[in-house]
Amino acid sequence: MKEEGFIHLCQPDSGKSCGACCGLYNYADSTRESLVDRLRNRTRIFRETVKKANDPKVFLNRIRSIESPERIYDTIHCCEYLGFLDDEEKRVGCLLHPLQNDGEDMRDLSFYGRELCAGHICPSYHFISRDEKLSLTRIVDDWYLYGLCITDIDLVKEYFRFISEGICEVPRYERFEGRLKDIALDFFSLKISWPFRSTDANRFGKYYFDGSQYMISHIDYDHLGYERSRFDKIFLSLTSSFRTPDELREGEEIIRKNIEEFISCYKTDAIL
Ligand code: SF4
Ligand code: SF4
């Protein structure tokens, strides 16, 4: 039973969705272009081959014979049944889902099985507040960026904490349109365009895998001769690696300017 006012983060509206827990971003090449190719091919082949109960296995074998299996973390499953749900390629999702197959639920054929796939709720549902959920789903319209951001709890909570402190209230989600939406979108787009992103192959957000367990890749402030930055959590979420104190300062400036611009614009718009 869903609570009143429940916000479905997986499929929030007709313009985007998330497929992160199906392994979407765990491919060695998880650039937008590469994922679009992957999902587009799968969707086409699924529609061509899957007509009856056992066909998904034929589909699976075909996909495995043509796709690169290289992953960031071998321990995280990347499900081949993730594809596009709509012709416009705005929503990613499960090709085995009953809504995609005239009511027939084929998820039992998957690695996790129907029960796990249908019942999974990721930590973002619990830790991201209702206001933050409503705001973020207004700010980000595109599936690729949306999935990266909605699963990054620290990034979301830190940004809203900084702007809330500056405007002395929780920003009202209705305000995320026009210029305010653009400024917030600029911030969340750093998830893709951050200039100080580490190139280490085994990094994902703040985590890296040391061969046996997931560890947080902390920033070595001592080495940079710097105090721990107030934006430390944001830096970690952005997979940062700073080689010099100047790079660290530049990173702080990018974040500071965005937050201050948002605060100023929010206050000015409120007066007008
Ligand atoms: S990571 Fe969370 S929001 Fe994304 S599809 Fe999975 S459960 Fe849904
Ligand atoms: S079968 Fe499960 S893991 Fe695979 S795409 Fe569907 S919901 Fe995701």
Task: Identify the function of each model-found stretch.
Residues 1-20, 26-29, 43, 60-272:
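Short loop/turn segments that flank or connect secondary-structure elements
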Residues 34-69:
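Charged, glycine/proline-rich intrinsically disordered loops and linkers
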